[in-house]
């Protein structure tokens, strides 16, 4: 007959469980304490983009966002404007749903490493994307571009945003002092790069298809969007579309450009200022910002001041 556990043995088990939990808690706080203030600003700032992506992907796939699915991530910030469920095929919807869950994880990972801040006001309306596309082409598209209309439109809208975060992590990494910070950014960068690669590959498969009703190819859309981001980000080429002049392709030998990179096929870097330039202004100086209507959030006053000096928020 099995011996019943005694009070003493139960107490001993409880003690060891408490010890393990307290050690884990202490280790977690030790990691947070290891992050210097200079790193905190660089880690918090990407939350603006990660929250934007999380809402954009979740609403497109599920018809609801952080407020319904992961409300604690919003930290009481305002709900996004104009975002909606997209008219997607089952295959694309499945991919975007995966992206949404990945972004929830990214937001949680950053918030568990630094204090974070309430979700900023995000404008993900069709009108906001239409303004970006009009700016990219230097004319008013008729009818206005609707990112939620179909697979191609939505993937082109996706092309606008995640790549900015990817290059932002590349730009931030050399400035980070703590190994804990660099480990976090490396993990974020790896998945953001994967998302960007999938989006580009799906669009590259249809690069020569016309986007209706505009009669403009998918490749030309990507080229125009990339040119706009280069303009807004300043400091030369940090972005290339799906089909380029051969000298701009890998090793200067090919026009197909399914992954964007420099002359050595390394990812382009962007500073936080230029990341926000690509997401808040969308060539709308001096009119209202695109996806982040109010000033981006973060704890670096000098950084926010420099962004304002660029007249991009």
From Swiss-Prot:
Query: What does UniProt give as the signal peptide span?
Result: 1-26
Q: What's in the keyword line of the UniProt record?
A: Signal, Stress response
Annotated GO biological processes are: cellular response to desiccation; cellular response to salt
The domain of life for this entry's organism is Eukaryota
Key word Ribonucleoprotein present in the record? no
Does this entry carry the keyword tRNA-binding? Answer: no
Signals that turn on the gene: By desiccation (leaves) and by abscisic acid (ABA) (leaves and callus).
InterPro entries in the record: Pigment-catalase-like
Looking at the Swiss-Prot or TrEMBL record, what is one Pfam family this protein matches? Ferritin_2
Protein name stated in the entry: Desiccation-related protein PCC13-62
Protein source organism: Craterostigma plantagineum (Blue gem)
């Amino acid at each position: 007959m099995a011996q019943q556990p005694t009070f003493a043995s139960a107490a001993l088990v409880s003690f060891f469980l408490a010890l393990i939990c307290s050690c884990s808690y202490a280790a977690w706080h030790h990691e947070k304490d290891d992050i210097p203030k200079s790193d905190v600003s660089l880690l918090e700032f990407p939350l603006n983009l990660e929250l934007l992506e999380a809402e954009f992907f979740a609403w497109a796939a599920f018809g609801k966002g952080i407020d319904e699915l992961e409300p604690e991530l919003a930290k009481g910030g305002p709900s996004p404007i104009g975002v909606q469920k997209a008219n997607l095929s089952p295959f694309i919807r499945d991919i975007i749903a995966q992206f949404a869950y990945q972004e929830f994880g990214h937001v949680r990972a950053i918030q568990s490493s630094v204090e974070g801040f309430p979700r900023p006001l995000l404008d993900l309306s069709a009108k906001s994307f239409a303004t970006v596309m009009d700016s990219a082409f230097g004319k008013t598209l008729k009818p206005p571009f609707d990112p939620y209309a179909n697979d191609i439109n939505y993937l082109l809208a996706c092309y606008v945003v995640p790549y900015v975060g990817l290059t932002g992590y590349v730009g931030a990494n050399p400035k980070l002092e703590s190994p804990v910070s660099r480990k976090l950014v490396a993990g974020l960068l790896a998945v953001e790069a994967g998302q960007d690669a999938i989006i580009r590959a799906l669009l590259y498969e249809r690069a020569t298809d016309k986007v209706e009703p505009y009669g403009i190819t998918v490749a030309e859309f990507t080229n125009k969007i990339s040119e706009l981001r280069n303009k807004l980000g300043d400091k030369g080429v940090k972005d290339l579309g799906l089909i380029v002049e051969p000298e701009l392709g890998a090793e200067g030998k090919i026009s197909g450009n399914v992954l964007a990179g420099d002359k050595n096929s390394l990812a382009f870097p962007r500073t936080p200022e230029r990341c926000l330039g690509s997401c808040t202004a969308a060539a709308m100086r001096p009119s209202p910002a695109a996806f982040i209507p109010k000033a981006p959030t973060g704890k670096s006053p000098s950084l926010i001041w420099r962004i304002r000096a660029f007249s991009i928020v």
